[in-house]
Amino acid sequence: MRLERNLTNRKCVCQYHLSFNIQPSMSLTIGDPAPDFSAPNQQGDTVQLSDFRGKKVVIYFYPKDDTPGCTAQACNLRDNYSELQQAGYEVIGISGDGVKSHDKFANKYELPFTLVADEDKSINEAYGVWKEKSMYGRTYMGTARTTFVLDEEGTITDIIEKVKTKDHTAQILK
């Protein structure tokens, strides 16, 4: 990070020049094997995707714990969790938040599924969801809300990029 200062009329104007050195990930498509990962869940226990072999899995990437859209999405999955389980799915939520944040979020909303802490964004990058975003004229790197549906062999069977947070279960079970 480089900091430049321009002093004008006794006002300090600071400009930050940030550069992100992120390797572009391959774009995953339906039929691809889901990248394996190993990271802590909300209890601090290590979760590895390969441990779910033999089960269908929903992996949903979301930007931030306890924010309106992310909470709506998590609560929709919570409210329909038994329906997802009856269809044979395990659910894993992944964001860049830490273990403590995930634990607080899961407890506050009584989320019955696993939340994985991807603080270094390596899982986001492997799945191609760590992207440049724009808000209010400002660009930044962040998680693109995306869901991957996997079969029992760990193969991607669906990718949902236009997530309807309040009706997400219906998108998954379509």
Q: PLM features: what roles do these ranges have?
A:
Residues R10, Q23-P24:
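Serine/threonine-rich, low-complexity intrinsically disordered segments
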Residues S25-K174:
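Chalcogenol-based redox active-site neighborhoods
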Residues L3, Y16-F20:
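Intrinsic disorder
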